[in-house]
Swiss-Prot record:
This is Large ribosomal subunit protein uL13. Belongs to the universal ribosomal protein uL13 family. InterPro entries: Ribosomal_uL13, Ribosomal_uL13_bac-type, Ribosomal_uL13_CS, Ribosomal_uL13_euk/arc, Ribosomal_uL13_sf. Part of the 50S ribosomal subunit. Interacts weakly with proteins L3 and L6. It comes from the Archaea. Keywords: Ribonucleoprotein, Ribosomal protein, RNA-binding, rRNA-binding. The keyword Metal-binding does not apply. One of its GO terms (cellular component) is cytosolic large ribosomal subunit. The keyword RNA-binding applies. One of its GO terms (biological process) is translation. The gene is rpl13. NCBIfam families: L13_A_E, PRK06394.1.
Amino acid sequence: MSVAEFDADVIVDARDCIMGRVASQVAEQALDGETVAVVNAERAVITGREEQIVEKYEKRVDIGNDNGYFYPKRPDGIFKRTIRGMLPHKKQRGREAFESVRVYLGNPYDEDGEVLDGTSLDRLSNIKFVTLGEISETLGANKTW
């Protein structure tokens, strides 16, 4: 019996996959009416120089005030916010699609998730990347993964 309470049509494994590529395919599947669960979000990667990536996310977290824009620090929140950016989340269709997506740290399901085509880190010759878990630690998130 799986620990997850969300009954997903598709389980996607984000381990060693490029976050943006996974997020775009997950958003597309959600818009098509499928319920999607993304597992191992803390091990998804963003390509590029670590200093630039961390600086970009620190800037996003610092923007706003007590009432203003909130940007997540945890890996699952960052991943879900990325998916939201690829959906028309201000329209009914986009809201429904966004509600049909769950992002998890680790894998609460009994079966392993599938790796989506074209998302694996193996496709790049670039060896510069940083995982979402490392970004979250730098941003000051409590490490629970």
